[in-house]
């Protein structure tokens, strides 16, 4: 019997970690126990819904059929993110779609950026690598069609389109570091 990712996140959010423990690997469970609250992100997401003009929201992928107006109208009268998502959600506008649109509003990701990024070879952003395995991995990355970002100097190998996408990645990392009160890696690979 397995839980869905949504159920696992809900259990962790509600502090029901014992129920989650049997459905995740031990290292994930340890991360969940020490995960910071997401309140700051939720406040930023509501702020983004309030501050972004409807015309700008309309440019977000999947924000169609007047959904931007619904989000903005409801955002004016809610006490927080969870209430906003709940009130915007309908059979037509499922909650995962609403949350994705709010995340895109926070990060400034519009449909054009998504479409351009999907049409281009971007990059391999190596988040972490074991020092003992790095020598095996480096030749693989060297023969890839995508530039591997292992150190800051590798950024110069990015095409203009890839750089545009990478800048959003870095911004997302900075937002995450801010809302979780953790240090930002600045896009650098961590060798462990």
What is the predicted function of each stretch?
Residues 1-192:
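Active-site cores that bind ATP or allylic diphosphates and position pyrophosphate for catalysis
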């Amino acid at each position: 019997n397995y839980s869905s990712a949504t159920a696992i996140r809900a259990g962790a959010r509600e502090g029901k970690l014992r129920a989650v423990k049997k459905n995740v690997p031990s290292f994930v469970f340890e991360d969940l126990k020490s995960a910071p609250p997401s309140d700051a992100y939720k406040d930023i997401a509501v702020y983004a819904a309030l501050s972004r003009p409807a015309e700008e929201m309309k440019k977000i992928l999947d924000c169609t059929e007047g959904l931007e107006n619904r989000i903005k109208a409801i955002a004016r009268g809610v006490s927080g993110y969870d209430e906003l998502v709940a009130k915007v959600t309908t059979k037509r506008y499922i909650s995962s779609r609403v949350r994705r649109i709010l995340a895109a509003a926070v990060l400034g990701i519009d449909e054009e950026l998504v479409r351009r990024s999907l049409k281009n070879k971007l990059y391999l952003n190596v988040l972490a690598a074991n020092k003992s395995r790095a020598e095996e991995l480096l030749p693989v990355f060297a023969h890839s069609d995508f530039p591997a970002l292992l150190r800051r100097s590798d950024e110069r190998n990015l095409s203009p389109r890839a750089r545009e996408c990478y800048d959003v990645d870095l911004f997302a990392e900075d937002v995450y570091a801010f809302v979780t009160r953790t240090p930002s890696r600045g896009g650098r690979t961590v060798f462990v």
